[in-house]
Amino acid sequence: MDSALFKTIALIGKHKNPDIVIPLLSLAEYLTDRGISVVLDSLTAAHISNSRYPILTLEEIGKQADLAIVLGGDGTMLNIARALVPFSVPLIGINQGRLGFLTDLTADTMHETLNDMLAGQFVVENRMLLTVEVTRNGESVFKELAFNDVVLHRGISSGMIELEVHINGEYVYSLRSDGLIIATPTGSTAYALSSGGPILHPGLNLMTLVPICPHTLSNRPIVIGADATIEIKVHFTTEIKIYTDSHSWFDLSEHDRVFIQRCPETIKLLHPVHHSYYRMLREKLGWSGILQKNSR
């Protein structure tokens, strides 16, 4: 990918967040001064004073923009990534949220960093997604994409749910628990991590299945290849919901079947050349620094 392709850049901010207005307009002016055409997402533009830049829907952005810069947190980045994945528009994230696992630029240094990135000094990272489909009596009743994870959860019910898990047509285990998380490497640092799952490097083509509060302690997280097909059969339950990225949800019924597999498309993230996944983990998760020897 060459930076000369970035003739039109879309700016997308966290909706209804006044904190993004000043950095977004500053960024728009910075890009315009460099001869780049700037367009704004329609929902973002609805909350700022704008009479200068064209306003497009996300679908129009997908068809017209060479790059999308997202100002917000990981939640905003997840939503925009899912919407733009059919168009293969690369994304740069500027963190205006809390942790910022996906948004690694800061508003304070974005101009300096973008100088290098727009000159072609960046690294491309392709992130995998999941497709999930629910069938009921042989008919499809729910389809969605997940960038982070697919979660089956008991909702507000006090009882456990019962699931039967198959991988590539082979029975793996039955599970009585509060739920089950199926996470991508991107999602391995989200809900799956807080439920005891492993951290997966985003360059790996893997998925992890992480039980939520299992009744049997031997039900541990497992890691499988991304080319696998997961089938989950829903057994007796009072209430169970399926969530994708905590965004879309659907009520499941007994005997429903859930099919999860890797999406053929990927999300293209652009990082500065000095980006380090391990440094990011240290900073976001508060890991200790290098041990120093005592000098005596």
From Swiss-Prot:
Functional description taken from the UniProt entry: Involved in the regulation of the intracellular balance of NAD and NADP, and is a key enzyme in the biosynthesis of NADP. Catalyzes specifically the phosphorylation on 2'-hydroxyl of the adenosine moiety of NAD to yield NADP.
InterPro entries found in the cross-reference section: ATP-NAD_kinase_N, ATP-NAD_kinase_PpnK-typ_C, NAD/diacylglycerol_kinase_sf, NADK
Gene for this chain: nadK
Enzymatic reactions: NAD(+) + ATP = ADP + NADP(+) + H(+)
Disulfide bonds: none
Positions with a binding annotation for NAD(+): D74, G75, N148, D149, R176, D178, T189, A190, Y191, A192, L193, S194
GO cellular component entries: cytoplasm
Nucleotide-binding listed as a keyword: yes
Active site: D74 (proton acceptor)
MF terms in GO: ATP binding; metal ion binding; NAD binding; NAD+ kinase activity
Entry EC number(s): 2.7.1.23
Main location per the UniProt record: cytoplasm
Family: Belongs to the NAD kinase family.
Cofactor: a divalent metal cation
Protein name according to UniProt: NAD kinase
Keyword flag Nucleotide-binding: yes
Native species: Nitrosomonas europaea (strain ATCC 19718 / CIP 103999 / KCTC 2705 / NBRC 14298)
Keywords, comma-separated and alphabetical: ATP-binding, Cytoplasm, Kinase, NAD, NADP, Nucleotide-binding, Transferase
Subcellular location(s) per record: Cytoplasm
